[in-house]
Amino acid sequence: MISLRIHEQPIHDQPRERLARQGAGALSDAELLAILLRVGTNGTNVLQLAQQLLAESGGLQGLQRLDFQELCRLHGMGVSKAASVKAALEIGRRLARSAIEERFPIRSPADVATLLLVEMSHLDQEHLRTILLDTKNRVQQITTVYIGSLNSANVRVGEVFKEAVRRNSAAIIVVHNHPSGEPTPSMEDIEITRQLVSAGRLLDIEVVDHLIIGNGRYVSLRERGLGFE
């Protein structure tokens, strides 16, 4: 197979050269992706390959939603390229979340959605996370507590509050996703919420809310008065 590398393009057209001259902000999504991919495929240079991948996946958001194996199966990818792309997207996601966490305290369910909605809408398993808050409702930490099917029998209260106790948090917000895409709370979700609210009172750690995320939407159990009676 003949691979066309970035350095085989005219020097003024090379994404790396343009980045050095004009800065990363001047590059298109395809040019940035081409730098990560490094080489194209037979008959397709690396910039064309990057453009094709973005078109097929629905842009950078589409690439973010693909898991590692799905990335590997895209035409022209393979394990090495998929690993580079996945790592770069994860770095970007972490930086974005860190910036949001530092910018403002949590005041509403919408603030929680700003932090986690996009990422958790597309998880293919249930994840339960806790957002740890200080006395001014600023985010201390976001912790993944469970991955897998959640019910009142397998959710251990001690695990949910473990990091909050260690960090001396004033409050927590519980967030989990429904892989089905439907965020309507189940009876199990409501029962889990009741148990956590009760435990929080004993530990003097307020459970501010429990959000369920699904397919770009979310439900606040506190707003609906479910489990916070």
Swiss-Prot record:
- Annotated keywords: Hydrolase, Metal-binding, Metalloprotease, Protease, Zinc
Q: Does the record bear Chloroplast in its keywords?
A: no
Kinase among keywords: no
- Biological source species: Chloroflexus aurantiacus (strain ATCC 29366 / DSM 635 / J-10-fl)
The protein's matches in Pfam families, at most eight in alphabetical order, are given as: RadC, UPF0758_N
Q: Which GO terms describe its biological process?
A: proteolysis
Q: Which InterPro entries does this one have? A: MPN (IPR037518), RadC_JAB (IPR025657), RuvA_2-like (IPR010994), UPF0758 (IPR001405), UPF0758_CS (IPR020891), UPF0758_N (IPR046778)
> Its family?
Belongs to the UPF0758 family.
PROSITE patterns xrefs: MPN, UPF0758
What this protein is called in its record is UPF0758 protein Caur_3603
Q: Where does motif JAMM motif map?
A: 176-189
PANTHER family given for it? DNA REPAIR PROTEIN RADC (PTHR30471), UPF0758 PROTEIN YEES-RELATED (PTHR30471:SF3)
Which ranges form a coiled coil?
none
